[in-house]
Amino acid sequence: MFVGNRLRITGGFIVRPDGVSQGDLTIENGIIVSMEQVASKEKVKGIDEDRVIDAQGAWVLPGLIDIHCDAIEKEVEPRPNTLFPMDMAFLQFERKLAGHGITTMLHSLSLGVGLSLRGEHLVAEMIDLIASMRAERGMIRHGVHLRYEVSHLTGFGLAERLISDGLIDYLSLMDHAPGQGQYHRPGAFQRYVMKNQGVGLDEVAAIVEELEGRRSRVDWAKLKALTAEARSRGIAVASHDDDSASAVERSLDFGASISEFPLSLGTAQYAYGKGMGVCLGAPNIVRGGSHDGNLKAVDAILEGVADILCSDYHPASLLHSIFKLESEGLSLHKAVAMATINPAKALGRADKVGSIELGKRADVIVVRKVRDIPLVVSTIVDGTVVHATQDFA
């Protein structure tokens, strides 16, 4: 691995905020210090040959920034009730993320009713682990996206503490109750619970009654104060599964600046028109549509009413979705922006990361295609090569 103060990437197609051009990139002390638009064969003084990455015509992109991904849950609990040590799962997952070109990951942790990693104890444990790992070492930049289920009344105090202790980077509000969001269609919630929990009609009726009882006791004023406190600390707030213009208006009233996964094109148009960032899932793009029949992400993006991509639950999809969008007619630099500078802006970090520009932190990936599939061959974080691979034949 290259760990020196200087590093040069030569002969690549550099994806900048305003376009793509072939050239060289020089990094010093973790900062992008020069960018030559025409590839140079001259040796840079002070940079040894072993600190040069010859991109050989590959793409040179900013490191990907993922603001919504819950894949860490499957790393800790790959099968129901089968938990692995968190530190082991985290460290192994980090290596996968570097290999997928993700240089900033906000791990999406759900604070809601349930067992395993979505329960309060394990969520708090994972957040503490992320904080300690961030302080000690890292291959990539880690953060926490707290997904708070509004009807999880007993978790409110923990959400307050996590925000006040500075352990949260991004907050979203979820309302997975019957008739709300992705369960807005009659019977959708009941069908989901019966399928995933293996319960009958009587049991699901009891679950619905209990959930609706909790939702009726939500203190919306306290919830609004929570989001205000988050925003005062520089934490972006998002809504989740907005299903109508009125839902967007409620989200705006709570200070949300990002709408995650709006369920229809009309809702995405409304949210974007109100100045919200609109975040859609990369798996939706790669697979050609929503897994549950909602908004087709490509439609909203080509319509110009969505500006952020996230991997949702499948980290490999983030890079693939960028090139899929290019094949759909979106210019490459605009597609790249959706997984780099746009999420950086949404988080208030665009002055440091998210694009290949002079003076920014050197979070960079080198990408080439194999069988028309984009693959990361080098990942650089803060000027250090944390991942590199080469085919043996």
How would you name each of these model-derived features?
Residues M1-R8, I14-L61:
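Histidine-rich, glycine-flanked metal-binding segment
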Residues K274-N284, G288-K369:
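His/Asp/Glu-enriched, well-ordered alpha-helical/loop segment
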Residues L111-D242, D312:
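Metal-coordinating catalytic core of metallo-dependent amide/deamination hydrolases
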Residues L146-G157, D241-S246, R250, I258-E260, ...:
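Active-site glycine- and acidic-residue-rich loops that bind
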